[in-house]
Regions:
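ABC family nucleotide-binding domain
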Residues: 24-239, 243
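ABC-family P-loop ATPase nucleotide-binding domain
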Residues: 1-35, 245-250
Length: 250
């Protein structure tokens, strides 16, 4: 009766997010479902997920491969839409936003950090960090100043002119974090940020994320590694598309 147990757990965990509207939450999801149709079969990647995230939260979303955690991360990042349910971001209903509003959110309000870094191989660290500023039309002189400041904030001030193949894995991830920070977003989404790094470098990257949280950033990371999740202040566990546990560590 595992399904029934998970549904009961989901209903209990959703109590705080059951009422309509965003309240004081930075993020509120209410009864999110994501269903894919493959031939005659329906695959439910998310099954009625509801939770609130207050400002300045440090949250880890954990679960095994195929649990739905990356699908949920894509929803939070406005990269995908639910089959049903609602998502409020900064008090606004995401389903009512047009393409320009969504593009603005992805560029200005959310900073993305990916497992594979997603850096342009022929561009310098400085130019890679400038890219979000180029997309939103920031003037060149201000753009360079902001990109330099972001790289200095992740201790890469001396590597601005280096290309990705001239940097270590940890340095590449620092460039990716600087790129996520450059627009001063309210939320940083990190999808398996240490997945391609050794244990020592992983700890360095997590200490950097810890520091960014202490500076007031909302950090949401997806991971399957429990030692990485332990850096967060709150952990939501996903199993078979549902929340199986929502616990506060500190």
């Amino acid at each position: 009766m595992m399904v029934a147990t998970l549904v009961d757990n989901q209903n209990a965990l959703s109590g705080a997010a059951a009422k309509n509207g965003p309240g004081d939450a930075l993020i509120r999801t209410q009864n999110l479902w994501k269903t894919y149709v493959m031939g005659e079969e329906e695959i439910h990647a998310l099954r009625g997920v509801s939770f609130d995230i207050p400002p300045n939260e440090y949250l880890a979303i954990v679960g095994p491969s195929g649990s739905g955690k990356s699908t949920l991360m894509n929803m939070i990042g406005c990269l995908d839409t639910p089959t049903q349910g609602e998502y409020w971001l900064n008090g606004k209903l995401v389903s009512q936003m047009d393409d320009d509003e969504l593009a603005h959110i992805r560029n200005k309000e959310i900073g993305f950090v990916f497992q594979t870094f997603n850096l342009l191989p022929r561009a310098t660290a400085l130019h890679n960090v400038e890219l979000p500023l180029i997309y939103n039309g920031t003037p060149s002189s201000k753009r360079i100043e902001m990109a330099k400041h972001a790289l200095e904030s992740v201790e890469l001030g001396s590597r601005m002119g280096h290309k990705p193949n001239e940097l270590s894995g940890g340095q590449r991830q620092r460039v990716a974090i600087a790129r996520a920070l450059v627009n001063n977003p309210s939320i940083i989404l990190a999808d398996e940020p240490t997945g391609n790094l050794d244990s020592k470098t992983s700890e360095e990257i997590m200490l950097l994320l810890d520091h960014l949280h202490k500076q007031g950033n909302t950090i949401i990371l997806v991971t399957h590694e429990h030692d990485i999740a332990a850096h967060a202040h709150r952990v939501i566990s996903i199993l078979d598309g549902q929340i199986s546990k929502d616990e506060r560590l500190r």
